[in-house]
């Protein structure tokens, strides 16, 4: 826990002030005091609430009104002694619950992943003695010894550092290691700039040091994230909410119909109670689309597989559907919208300015003087040759071609960009021998090397332009040395910085005779400026296309980055992001209240110098405006924003395990274009889900109406509960998968996102279900009325009706392929799924009609061939009627 302390945050305090505020010393606290503080502050562990046991989570999947209907029907069947019917109905309910249980979200794993990041033991100094203790026993005031490879056990203020570098990517998302210091810092600094603090869960990459515990357990930065994650409520997707409402509406309709028919049959038909109950159970079972939850889950699963082939791993099934409704995508810049390969685009010398081709680490691309279409030729001994040798040799990175043919760099991206630039030009061979080196240091902001280069001894320097300008009195030109023209250089740097380029300068000086060592003092005079390189992380070409596709599809793309506003706006313009001419910073967002933030979140598309906490607030602000939000992230701090978003998108390559666990979707290539592909697939899946729902519902209505008509007419029960379940679970489910493989419609990415408030069962859908369901029911009833007086057995009549309904289903599946056009198109032949399920359906129907054990189980009997022909003709007639209905209702559908 954290001690209560007024005043400045720990990173602004000196070591002495920090020790005093937590009542400790360099020798640490005593064991007795540690025990007292442990009692006061609690264990150094992330708080967690107990999860539900698996059996309870399984039982929860029976909490559905339509499942209640099935369970009630099974109970009544048991009371009546119809054990086979009861077993079949119960099996259907259990299968639905199992599918829901298996597909259940694993969101709680993200919390466990955070807890797993804590180390198990730490070396603490107590009363001057080094003790290895469980990390759970650490308390504020403990002095912790840290070494390379250690995982930081709590939030610490550094009190001693020896080349201490820490990998904080899991917390900040920044891939570069952070050099730690003991000095106090000033200003309101973001997490990644607090270089005298160590954060729980991060890893020491090199060096050693000591730190004093200032926060434990839930009060650490990791604890705050854990608390945010635990407090985020799971949100249901639009389709799941709509299906809940549909289920309740069907439940109410079933109750009303059963009550009305019960009263009618008792008063006007004088039916035996047992026969009446059997009919009402059949009505209830017929009205429940038992297979629909399983069908939806399986169709979503097929969408998951399709997206996986496009490098998008879907972790939570409903995400597939939500992608199709997404209205805003908030994306990181580096690596997602850009190549994540820093590339030199311009070189400034005293004589000229050059532009450089190339957008990656591949050393390919010509160099041109500005306004000159002819590539430059690098003359031996020229200024440009010396400049290229300097950036090549004063450089700790290496350029490597992997076996796959891809080019990679080792070392930092800035040095790597300079190394690639030097490799784009073939320089005359020249022997070189490194004599001494000053590594890059964040305090001095340059690196320097002492080389024997051919016959001369030289000192080479690369670093921040403002620093090298202070070191240089002269500039090199092809005509010789000139006094440094500072206004020229500053003007050019400002010009290119406005275009989003990061600037790095290079300089040299002749070495002293016999010099073998290099010190900072050697650079205080005689340094000559050679040139300045402007570099950037270029946009991914496919991201530019993907953003254009998103904008055409009515999806706004917002770029969220830690870069400076000017850089962010420049990249935004290249990418074609909507309002890229304006940017807002994280500092400006922090001072806004929720109302102001919700306005800014919609007004701006470029968010610069932001923190992961800003992301979380931006998601909430956009959601408050009824936006369906996608959010990308890679660091642990991004996890709350990803969990809060409607679609959280984690980076598969640079993302942490915690982020992936919190996300709904993981990109295996960290590429924005993959998100756009997933949106396209999500829309296709939703279209096919809607077609499937429109396909399934008329069958249930037809079954229910057929039973109602039979009861009103006093006829024999046309379908038994097990036959109804056969149709709902076997034939309907089988045929539904044919629609799951339908290709996306041509305008799928040229229409706006669907409004999640519009129910999947809208006005037209209700009409189509009522129209087709009534037509099938009336056709089957007429056939039943024709068969009954001719002396056929109830089993034969039910078998004919079953085959009639199934054949009508098959033809209606073909109707559902195309929403408002003719269904028998070339796409029908391309959809192999339809022909596979048609073959499976034929086998199933042959089994239930002709296999003796199936006849005994379902009460069917064999049919002569002519009845297959009759049912085929009836089904084909209904197919033609629905095709004629499409153009007549097209205007209604459009409205």
Task: Spell out what each predicted region is.
Residues 816:
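A C-terminal functional module that forms or caps the active site or interfaces directly
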Residues 731, 776-777, 799-813:
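Generic alpha-helical transmembrane segments
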Residues 756-774, 794-800:
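Membrane-water interface at loop-to-transmembrane-helix junctions
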Residues 1-750, 758-761, 774, 785, ...:
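Conserved cytosolic headpiece of P-type ATPases
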